């Protein structure tokens, strides 16, 4: 079931204010017009058939729904194509007579037609103007008691609206105060956070400066560590130069043998010196076979065999055997000097050499001298080899004189 549509608006006709009320429900149109000052009222009911018949008589047919929409648009003044006029029966007759061209007839005041009002819906098109009249019978003035009740209701409603307005104003004032308090609090928080941000920026600046200082100090420390790491290389260079000088100056003389300092680094293996010492040992062995008697040579061979067997257990001893042979040559003159008395160098004898170097345990002596010479430089090894060669030459010359 369709709900009724109600619409009310105030309009001025001939300088007087009128209240127009429309109600549309179930294909029935109800129109009521009331004059505000005199409280006179006119009301009319129109069904869909009567409305469509009215529009057909005017020559411009409109359906009921379209006609109601046009009436609402004219009442709300939402369209310039439609408008409203309120005429009496005399005004309507005057317009008809003017259109036809005859004299106007004025109805008597006692006629019921004179009390009617006609609500005219004027529809303006481009080259035409159509009038749709709606007759509204007079229903009399409003009841005073009803008017009083209506006024009282309106006054109560007005008081209620004023009370609501007062509460709304109070709510607005409360919200305004709350907004101001929130604004003040936010401003205070903003100032505090701005101050904290300034302090944090200052602290960050100080920390950045501190980081730069620490970075510079770290760079200085690293540079100092690198220079200190490269500084010990100078004594090594000096030792190398000194070893070269001592090697050049050791030709033809036997330098005193000094024990290696404790904790020194073991010498680096020199393959050239090792090959030279091996060749020298081979030549010395050949010379000994030629000059020494058979018993002495056989004992020397046994000593060398035992030395090779002891050195074959460890590859490092073969490299140190050249150094130990030179140390044996040094020990023989020292013992000979201690037994002979004077410190002058005397030629080696076969008995003394056999008693010291051949009859003694050569492997034990080689191991001990090898341990002493672990920290010596290649220059000391070469000087010992030279001394050993000189001792062998002296020994060979001694053997030649005995034979």
UniProtKB/Swiss-Prot annotation:
Which protein are we looking at? Centrosomal protein CCDC61
Q: What is known of its domains?
A: The coiled-coil domain is involved in microtubule-binding.
List the top taxonomic levels of the source: Eukaryota, Metazoa, Chordata, Craniata, Vertebrata
Q: Which organism is it from?
A: Gallus gallus
Any coiled-coil regions, as ranges? 144-178
Q: Name one GO cellular component term.
A: microtubule organizing center
Query: Which GO BP terms, alphabetically?
Result: cell projection organization; centriole assembly; mitotic spindle assembly
Q: Where is the composition biased (Basic and acidic residues)?
A: 236-247, 276-289
Low complexity compositional bias, start-end: 310-328, 349-360
């Amino acid at each position: 079931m369709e709900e009724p549509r109600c619409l009310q608006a105030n309009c001025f006709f001939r300088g007087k204010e009128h209240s127009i009320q429309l109600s549309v429900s179930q294909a029935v149109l109800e129109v009521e017009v009331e004059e505000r000052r005199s409280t006179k009222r006119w009301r009319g009911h129109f069904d869909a058939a009567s409305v469509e018949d009215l529009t057909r008589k005017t020559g411009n047919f409109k359906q009921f729904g379209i006609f109601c929409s046009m009436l609402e648009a004219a009442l709300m003044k939402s369209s310039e194509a439609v408008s409203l006029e309120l005429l009496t029966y005399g005004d309507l007759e005057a317009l008809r007579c003017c259109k036809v061209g005859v004299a106007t007839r004025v109805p008597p005041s006692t006629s019921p037609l004179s009390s009617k009002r006609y609500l005219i819906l004027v529809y303006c098109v481009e080259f035409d103007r159509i009038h749709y009249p709606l007759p509204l019978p007079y229903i009399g003035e409003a009841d005073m008691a009803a008017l009083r009740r209506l006024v009282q209701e309106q006054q109560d409603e007005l008081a209620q609206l004023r009370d609501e307005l007062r509460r709304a104003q109070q709510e607005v004032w409360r919200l305004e105060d709350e907004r101001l308090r929130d604004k003040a609090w936010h401003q205070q928080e903003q100032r505090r956070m701005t101050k904290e941000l300034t302090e944090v920026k200052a602290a960050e600046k100080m920390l950045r400066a501190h980081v730069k200082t620490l970075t510079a100090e770290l760079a200085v420390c690293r540079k100092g560590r690198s220079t200190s790491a490269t500084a010990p290389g100078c004594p090594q260079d000096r030792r190398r130069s000194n070893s070269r000088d001592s090697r050049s100056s050791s030709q033809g003389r036997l330098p005193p043998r000094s024990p290696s300092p404790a904790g020194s680094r073991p010498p680096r293996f020199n393959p050239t010196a090792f090959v030279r010492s091996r060749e020298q040992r081979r030549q010395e062995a050949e010379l000994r076979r030629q000059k020494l008697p058979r018993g002495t040579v056989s004992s020397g061979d046994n000593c060398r065999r035992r030395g090779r067997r002891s050195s074959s257990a460890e590859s490092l001893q073969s490299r140190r055997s050249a150094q130990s042979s030179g140390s044996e040559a040094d020990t023989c003159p020292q013992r000979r000097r201690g037994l002979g008395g004077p410190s002058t160098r005397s030629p080696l004898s076969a008995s003394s050499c056999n008693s010291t170097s051949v009859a003694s345990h050569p492997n034990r002596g080689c191991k001990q001298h090898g341990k002493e010479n672990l920290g010596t430089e290649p220059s000391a090894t070469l000087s010992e080899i030279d001394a050993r060669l000189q001792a062998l030459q002296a020994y060979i010359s001694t053997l030649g004189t005995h034979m």
